[in-house]
Amino acid sequence: MARMDFNNIVGDPFALIAWLLSFATCVISDIQGAFPNFAWWAVGYMLCAIIGISLVLASQTSHVYGVAIVGYLAAGLTFTTLAVNSLIYDDQASKQAGAAGFILQSMVTIVWIFYFGSSSQTSSRPYLDSMGAGKEHPSYRNSKPLSTNYGARPETVVSGNQPPQMYTSAQLNGFETSSPVSGYPPTAANGAENGTQNRFVGPAIGSQSNLGGGSTLGADHPSTPNEVSQPTVYPYRAKAIYSYEANPDDANEISFSKHEILDVSDVSGRWWQAKKASGETGIAPSNYLILI
């Protein structure tokens, strides 16, 4: 269960102010004379929408209910727009003031639809957060299930066993062997060549006993299938849109704070190899970073 933080609601009062303006002016207009009933439906619907969104923001679960919120807000935008059309052309000042309140609600709704409907990696998301559009605290996103079950990750010596590497014939061009039977010690003519080939392919199953004590395969060509060399070039720069705490059970992950700048070597996967300004390197989830 997420921790309730009502500071998120206090920091974004525009929708509530617009609704109070619409409600007060609609009450005055209804007392003074005839008033369209549809405007009351818009007032009630937007009140329910504001309460629901306030609870979502307070519980910091907008990433869970974002799709549903966008659907409800789309209907609310239709209702407020129709309410404006039914009030703004009247000569009564209170109805025109009510139309102004619905216009403000429509503007806030448009911003909300963009905020909840866009990805957290968009460049405008931090700006909207600073202006109080959502103010979702990043700590709720920084959960352990994300770091352990997020997706495919680069395998290293520490993080696990890497499956055998498979190569195509084009990649092995130049490493062919002239020996008709695999698994026998290389001859003097093709020893170096087969030694290089065995580095990629290895002896046939059951033929290790045929190598004898004179085989120098391990000494001449040490095989480290689990080792992945660290990149030396980091051509990309990324900015952290949320803080992230590395999983203590995985030494390959790195922690970083919100708005911290990282150097990134590869942006093709879900986990990026990153380097901090302090020189610390490791992997970071791509949905916490945005390229700059």
Swiss-Prot record:
Gene Ontology CC terms: plasma membrane
- UniProt keywords, alphabetically: Cell membrane, Membrane, SH3 domain, Stress response, Transmembrane, Transmembrane helix
Pfam families according to UniProt:
SH3_1
Gene3D superfamilies from the UniProt entry: SH3 Domains (2.30.30.40)
The ranges of region (Disordered) come to: 127-149, 203-231
Please tell me where this protein is predominantly located.
membrane
Q: How does it sit in the membrane?
A: Multi-pass membrane protein
Segments crossing the lipid bilayer: 9-29, 38-58, 64-84, 97-117
**Ranges for domain SH3:** 233-292
Classification via InterPro entries? SH3-like_dom_sf, SH3_domain, Sho1_SH3
**Topological domains, Extracellular:** 30-37, 85-96
Location in the cell reads:
Cell membrane
- Protein function: Plasma membrane osmosensor that activates the high osmolarity glycerol (HOG) MAPK signaling pathway in response to high osmolarity.
Name assigned to this protein:
High osmolarity signaling protein SHO1
What is the species listed in this Swiss-Prot or TrEMBL entry? Ajellomyces capsulatus (strain NAm1 / WU24) (Darling's disease fungus)
At the highest ranks, the source species' classification is: Eukaryota, Fungi, Dikarya, Ascomycota, Pezizomycotina
Q: Which gene encodes it?
A: SHO1
